[in-house]
Swiss-Prot record:
Family from the record: Belongs to the eukaryotic/archaeal RNase P protein component 1 family.
UniProt cross-references to InterPro entries, sorted A to Z: RNase_P/MRP_Rpp29_sf, RNP1, Rof/RNase_P-like, Rpp29/RNP1
Assembly and binders: Consists of a catalytic RNA component and at least 4-5 protein subunits.
Keyword rRNA-binding: no
Catalysis: reaction(s): Endonucleolytic cleavage of RNA, removing 5'-extranucleotides from tRNA precursor
Protein name stated in the entry: Ribonuclease P protein component 1
EC number: 3.1.26.5
Keyword Cytoplasm annotated: yes
Amino acid sequence: MPLTPETLPRHELVGLDCEVVAASNPDVIGISGTVVMETTQMLTLEGADRVWHVPKDSATFAFDLSTETVLVDGDRLVARPARRTENTGDSLWR
């Protein structure tokens, strides 16, 4: 499945450039970097000078694809990465 704005929430996020554009915690707004790790509840972004752990459920992320920037509500990403990206079986993400 190609990486498009419609399919982004079902893809592997590690390696994508990302920025926090909205969040319940104003301290994390504006954090940007490359996604280096993903867990069920967190995205880990590596910036120029440090590594940030941002909760998925309380933020909106802007992912930079090669052709455009895609906004994704973090609530859509809250799931085990393997479960969220699976292609077979009964899945809420399919």
